[in-house]
Amino acid sequence: MSLDIDQIALHQLIKRDEQTLDVVLRDSLLPTNAVVEEMMAELHRVYSAKSKAYGLFNEQSELADALKRSRKGDEDFLSFSRAATGRLRDELAKYPFAEGGVVLFCQYRYLAVEYLLISVLSSCHSMRVNEQLDLSTTHYLDINRADIVARIDLTEWETNPESTRYLTFLKGRVGRKVSDFFMDFLSAAEGLDTKAQNRGLLQAVDDYCADAELGKNERQAYRQQVYSYCNEQLQAGEEIALQVLAQELPKLGEKDFQQFSAEQGYALEESFPADRGTLRQLTKFAGSGGGLSINFDALLLDERIFWDAATDTLTIKGTPPNLRDQLQRRAGSK
């Protein structure tokens, strides 16, 4: 992995009681060694693999102003990180779910792009056995479960300040979104809506097929081609590029897919990240609720699975063998 650490600082937030969140600040940057490089490579890998939301700084963002000063050399990176940790403590203390953790600031390069990653990492307890087979307790950073993380694409931010996607962050699931306080700390707002872009793509594909008056099987085959390309991009960690997608798809009528989507006003970006859950709708129907969970290939609709809209009834002809076996055993036990 070609990851080069430029500067890295660690500080700590310690929760003393329900009302007190103390700050412990380092007096120097963390020296870069093999252990630090391994930790950052793992954090970068874990973060890159997770689904992220996109954002941008508000005009009055204190963090953005401080970061600009640091980038210009008016303030050193350590001072920037110490002041930012203090602001993070003040923001985090407002919330009942506030917990302590190790606060990490790392400026690094990956594939010719400069990033600033900010994270609050939890410290976990575990057990270890030494060479003498003695047992002792140990602490480790729970990087795999890190959910308070934001990353700023410094290259994008400085070369394209009007971008709505140079800042990415994870969304938490504890009470009020954990990400909310982090966004307040960053003084940032959500930018590019990845799910909306993917939903717009699906709608454009359906409308393009309808405009060409494709039959059911032809339409589903077209959706499958779209899904294959998008899924390949997702697996490779790359974005969906409309121009490339249009080149891979058969042209329907006088306009290719990119021309059609541009003229119809779907407001799709030239490229955007793939959303796994949304893209799955190209090839499958899925839903759950009221104790029922259903998932089936789109090709089965009107073949083995029929939906009556008037009565909201789904009829399935031919059940999966394992389900049929369970039903038969339950019926036989009555």
UniProtKB/Swiss-Prot annotation:
Subcellular location: Cytoplasm, Nucleoid
GO molecular function: double-stranded DNA binding; single-stranded RNA binding
GO cellular component, one term: bacterial nucleoid
UniProt keyword list: Cytoplasm
InterPro entries per record: Nucleoid_associated_NdpA
Pfam family of the protein (one): NA37
UniProt similarity note: Belongs to the YejK family.
Family annotation (NCBIfam families): PRK00378.1
Protein name listed in UniProt: Nucleoid-associated protein YPO1262/y2922/YP_0879
Organism: Yersinia pestis
